Regions:
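Short functional micro-motifs and their immediate structural scaffolds
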Residues: 152-156, 179
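Short linker/helix segments within small regulatory modules
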Residues: 158-169
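Residues immediately within or flanking Cys/His clusters that coordinate Zn2+
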Residues: 140-144, 168
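Short, charged early-sequence alpha-helical segments and their helix-coil boundaries
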Residues: 38-64
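Short terminal alpha-helical segments
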Residues: 1-32, 128-130
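Short metal-binding segments enriched for Cys and/or His
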Residues: 175-191
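Short cysteine-rich clusters marking metal-coordination/redox-active sites
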Residues: 147-150, 171-174
Length: 203
């Protein structure tokens, strides 16, 4: 099975036909898709003006979409390496009991669905790397009462619309599933009590 970097080379290879290069970009999303496969594809198509069903898109736009995806992947893998090293030090010091962050990282390791969007048409529109930097900043900070990406304070609760492991607090503005460890207990309680309302795209 081809890895991300091998698929990225296929996307950039001008000797391949455009349908194959597009297919390889879609396959990259099976290795790294911060919003989930469908939502990340929708995001890249919107930002780089690629028709979602266009089998022969402008190659420059394909490469630009890949560049954005690669930058985000670099940001996230650097954070994961830092997190893994910290856990190694903690275990060496005898701190072996997993915390809430450990469970969340286990489910998102590798970056697939790290900012999961249950509705593929509703997601942040900033560059992926910027979204991940905002999330990482929140993961390193004290819990807050707002979305770590767009700072929206209206947090709903998603159940049933996504796979069970993705149920939880959802930003009603940008559509991401908010990692529970970055929210205060009061914000989590409010999200559970509130309704998950229709989402609007965020610019």
């Amino acid at each position: 099975m081809a890895g991300f970097r091998s698929l990225a080379r296929e996307v950039r290879d001008p000797h391949h036909d455009l349908a194959l290069r597009r297919y390889s970009l879609r396959k990259c999303l099976e290795r790294f898709a911060p919003y989930g496969h469908r939502a990340t594809w929708d995001h890249l198509c919107a930002r780089h003006h690629i028709g979602p069903e266009d089998r022969a898109p402008d190659p420059a736009r394909l490469v630009a979409a890949l560049d954005e995806l690669e930058e985000a992947r670099t940001v996230w893998l650097a954070y994961e390496a830092e997190f893994a090293e910290r856990r190694k030090r903690e275990k060496h010091a005898g701190l072996r009991r997993p915390g809430p962050f450990d469970d969340w990282h286990r489910r998102t390791w590798g970056g697939c669905g790290v900012v999961w969007c249950a509705d593929p048409a509703v997601h942040p529109s900033w560059p992926l790397a910027e979204v991940l930097r905002r999330l990482i900043s929140a993961l390193r900070s004290d819990p807050a009462a707002c979305c770590p990406v767009c700072a929206e304070r209206s947090i709903g609760w998603s159940t049933g619309a996504a796979p069970e492991e993705w149920s939880g607090p959802v930003c009603t503005r940008c559509g991401i599933l908010v990692p529970q460890p970055v929210l205060t207990p009061a914000a989590l309680t409010g999200a559970r009590k509130g309704r998950h309302t229709a989402l609007a795209s965020v610019a």
